[in-house]
């Protein structure tokens, strides 16, 4: 299949390329930029005038809810949502039912995803059996089955001895450990940021120190074990400062933030809006602003959607009892564009945080727009506006704090390995 | 959202969910209306037909005797049909969701729901969900709000102290877990009380509580100085299990209201308690039963205040 993409604004965040030109794809790869290769016959031409052509988005946290939680979402629904959002690669965390803690489950997931032939799925394996924080999983086996890293997701290990051993063991084989810094005892079943809003609403609160103390432990254990760590969904100003200092010391550390936390604060909870029940909790305005600064200065490498489709019933409960999480695959692009506009960041810089940087963290070759690169592409209209609604969202989860909001940026075509999977 | 959670589009009370953001004019209207009902409660068994033909559902997902009973009495004095549902042992344990329960009861032509739930925001959730002709009264949700308790407290203060603008009020005890304290603070603020104090150990104060407009004290000797109104809070025994406090004995020693500590307040200060009391834990019997205590009148005013709230809602 030879595809000729005409007149698009080509943005390659990795190299900084940003120019309007033609792109030629063949055998699943980018074969030329600008000039038509000899003997290239268009099987398909895409007119991309006024549109942006960039690497497909790479999402570091997208729950697909399989196996076991199909009442919330299925692979079919969520991978369709992914490509509709321009996401071509995604890491799925192991908090399924059962958790991704044995090779058979991972192989099954990979197999199902391959058959659907939509976005590329990179499973993150459980660091401990059943995510219980006690016994290690067979990481090598899981790696061979397709796991790209190991994580506890939202079930932090309480016993630091176990965490140290897990990091040591992962480091033995060069596996990356993905951790969301949160001390389980300090979090104490809280559901909102400890501050004025939680105080007014009478909600059990999670103090910032639940993040910073866990972070300090992780940083010490990195030095002790030599493990390389990716920090998931940091939420606070103080946490960002710790990451900045650790990176200056040269620790092998990367970090992401959820797109929700880039835009929202605990004030958005309003009168107990369960769509704002997220983990980690939405924090204060000062925290959100510090996260944005951290994103701009490179302390935070990537933005993830933290996609978590939740069924209507599980959200129609009092705030603390409502299931946490928000759907996000289809919002990652427009909300990143919104963030870029608000912070006067150039498009290549903003897109780097959802393409090139997360691809490097995942250790995959996509995320660039260069000759010879795999043709995973997102072609979007930056000026197309749409209103987030139940009907617009393809994800089975309609739960998002952004319902009803008008956003700019709509994916027109998504290509994976040179094949049009959306558009 | 954007829609006000408890006022209708004319700015009238549609539900009573919290005292926060409740306009002073509505607050005073409730107190004035309650005043007009005190005669009724004292005249005994004389019914008023304001809620005749209306069905009031007492929806208590958490055990309560006093609050549920006063709501029931108030509704009956207004001639309403009262249906008591003890949800703690009902459909919820059979797996029915909160909103399913509400839908089923709405289908039985409920006009008003009185809701008590252990989760903050439960009454808001129900109020957002029900048909517009149904009114919801929050009878206590988690740690968040207990507006009718706060209103009856305001009624009591007005009875004994008249002018809110000249008062120093202290709220003493477990502020962190108290829906009563939160609702009191907002009501007192709206009614113009210039100085509200909270007195508690740091473990029983929520973060940034000063942002609610209160002065924070950790010491009863300083905190009770020149106070006109003392509002005691109930201490739950589980606070000892969760490392908030070492023992009830030590708590009583430093924060229990004894005659000696009461003597630090103004000589005409009144002592209040939302009940049920733990004698010897947060309050000494001598104070609870003493001349400055207005704890029993509080209970009585509770009926008039709840009649006022129900009749105002039914009229809107």
From Swiss-Prot, chain B:
- Stated EC number for the protein is 2.1.3.2
Q: Name one Pfam family in it.
A: OTCace
Q: In which pathway does it act?
A: Pyrimidine metabolism; UMP biosynthesis via de novo pathway; (S)-dihydroorotate from bicarbonate: step 2/3
- The record's top EC class is transferase
* Cited PROSITE patterns: CARBAMOYLTRANSFERASE
Sequence positions that bind carbamoyl phosphate: 66-67, 116, 146, 149, 275-276
**Gene Ontology molecular function terms on file:** amino acid binding; aspartate carbamoyltransferase activity
Asked if the record carries the keyword Transferase, the reply is yes
GO CC field: cytosol
Catalytic activity field: carbamoyl phosphate + L-aspartate = N-carbamoyl-L-aspartate + phosphate + H(+)
Annotated L-aspartate binding sites: 94, 179, 234
For biological process, the GO terms are: 'de novo' pyrimidine nucleobase biosynthetic process; 'de novo' UMP biosynthetic process; amino acid metabolic process
| Keywords assigned by UniProt, alphabetized | Pyrimidine biosynthesis, Transferase
Q: In which family does this protein belong, per the annotation?
A: Belongs to the aspartate/ornithine carbamoyltransferase superfamily. ATCase family.
Function, as annotated, reads: Catalyzes the condensation of carbamoyl phosphate and aspartate to form carbamoyl aspartate and inorganic phosphate, the committed step in the de novo pyrimidine nucleotide biosynthesis pathway.
Task: List the protein's name.
Answer: Aspartate carbamoyltransferase catalytic subunit
The organism named in the record is: Nitrosomonas europaea (strain ATCC 19718 / CIP 103999 / KCTC 2705 / NBRC 14298)
């Amino acid at each position: 299949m030879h595809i000729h993409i005409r007149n698009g604004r080509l943005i390659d965040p990795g190299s900084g390329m940003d120019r309007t030109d033609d792109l030629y794809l063949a055998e699943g790869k980018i074969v030329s930029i600008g000039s038509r290769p000899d003997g290239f016959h268009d099987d398909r031409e895409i007119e991309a005038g006024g549109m942006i052509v960039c690497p497909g988005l790479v999402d570091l946290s997208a729950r697909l809810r399989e196996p076991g939680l199909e009442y919330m979402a299925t692979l079919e629904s969520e991978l369709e949502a992914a490509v509709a959002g321009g996401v071509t690669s995604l890491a799925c965390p192991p908090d399924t039912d059962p958790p991704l803690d044995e090779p058979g489950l991972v192989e099954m997931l990979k197999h199902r995803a391959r058959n659907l032939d939509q976005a590329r799925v990179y499973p993150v394996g459980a660091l401990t059996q059943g995510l219980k924080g006690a016994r290690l999983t067979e990481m090598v086996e899981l790696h061979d089955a397709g796991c790209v890293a190991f994580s506890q997701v939202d079930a932090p290990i309480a016993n630091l001895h176990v965490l140290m051993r897990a990091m040591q063991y992962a480091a033995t084989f060069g596996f990356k450990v993905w951790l969301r810094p949160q001390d389980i005892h300090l979090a104490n079943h809280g559901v909102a940021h400890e501050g004025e809003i939680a105080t007014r609403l009478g909600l059990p609160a999670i103090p910032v120190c639940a993040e910073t103390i866990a972070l300090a432990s992780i940083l010490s254990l990195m030095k002790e074990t030599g493990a390389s760590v990716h920090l998931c969904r940091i939420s606070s100003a103080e946490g960002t400062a710790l990451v900045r200092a650790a990176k200056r010391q040269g620790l092998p550390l990367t970090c992401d933030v959820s797109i929700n936390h880039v835009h929202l604060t605990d004030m958005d909870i309003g009168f107990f809006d369960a769509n704002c029940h997220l983990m980690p909790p939405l924090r204060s305005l000062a925290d959100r602003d510090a996260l944005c600064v951290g994103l701009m200065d490179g302390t935070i490498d990537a933005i993830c959607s933290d996609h978590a489709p939740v069924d209507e019933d599980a959200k129609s409960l009092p705030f603390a009892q409502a299931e946490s999480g928000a759907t996000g695959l289809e919002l990652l692009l427009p909300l990143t564009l919104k963030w870029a506009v608000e912070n006067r960041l150039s498009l290549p810089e903003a897109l780097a945080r959802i393409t090139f940087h997360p691809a490097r963290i995942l250790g995959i070759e996509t995320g660039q727009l260069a000759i010879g690169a795999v043709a995973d592409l997102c072609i979007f209209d930056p000026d197309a506006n749409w209103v987030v609604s139940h009907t617009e969202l393809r994800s089975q989860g309609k739960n998002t704090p952004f319902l009803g909001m008008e956003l700019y940026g709509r994916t027109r075509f998504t290509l994976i390995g040179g094949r049009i999977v959306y558009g | 959202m954007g829609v006000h959670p408890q006022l209708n589009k004319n700015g009238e009370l549609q539900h009573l969910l919290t005292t926060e953001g409740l306009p002073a004019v509505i607050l005073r209207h409730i107190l004035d209306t309650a005043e007009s009902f005190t005669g009724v409660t004292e005249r005994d068994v004389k019914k008023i037909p304001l809620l005749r033909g209306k069905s009031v559902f007492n929806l208590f997902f958490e055990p309560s005797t006093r609050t549920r009973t006063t709501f029931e009495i108030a509704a009956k004095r207004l001639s309403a049909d009262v249906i008591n549902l003890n949800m703690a042992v009902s459909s919820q344990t059979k797996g029915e969701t909160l909103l399913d329960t509400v839908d089923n009861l709405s289908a039985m032509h409920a006009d008003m729901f009185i809701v008590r739930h252990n989760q903050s925001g439960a009454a808001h959730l129900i109020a957002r969900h029900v048909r517009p002709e149904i009114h919801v009264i929050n009878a206590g949700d988690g740690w968040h709000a207990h507006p009718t308790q706060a209103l009856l407290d305001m009624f009591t203060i007005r009875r004994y102290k008249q002018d809110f603008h000249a008062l120093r009020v202290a709220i003493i005890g477990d502020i962190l877990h108290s829906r009563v304290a939160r609702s009191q603070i907002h009501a007192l603020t709206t009614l113009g009380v210039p100085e509200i104090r909270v007195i508690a150990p740091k473990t029983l104060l929520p973060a940034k509580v000063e942002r609610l407009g209160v002065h924070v004290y950790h010491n009863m000797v300083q905190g009770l100085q020149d106070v006109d109104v003392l509002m005691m809070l109930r201490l739950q025994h589980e606070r000892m299990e969760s490392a908030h406090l070492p023992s009830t004995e030590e708590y009583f020693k430093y924060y229990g209201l004894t005659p000696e500590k009461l003597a630090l307040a103004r000589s005409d200060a009144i002592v209040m308690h939302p009940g049920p009391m733990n004698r010897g834990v947060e309050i000494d019997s001598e104070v609870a039963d003493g001349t400055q205590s207005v704890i029993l009148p509080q209970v009585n005013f509770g009926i008039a205040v709840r009649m006022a709230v129900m009749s105002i809602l039914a009229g809107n």
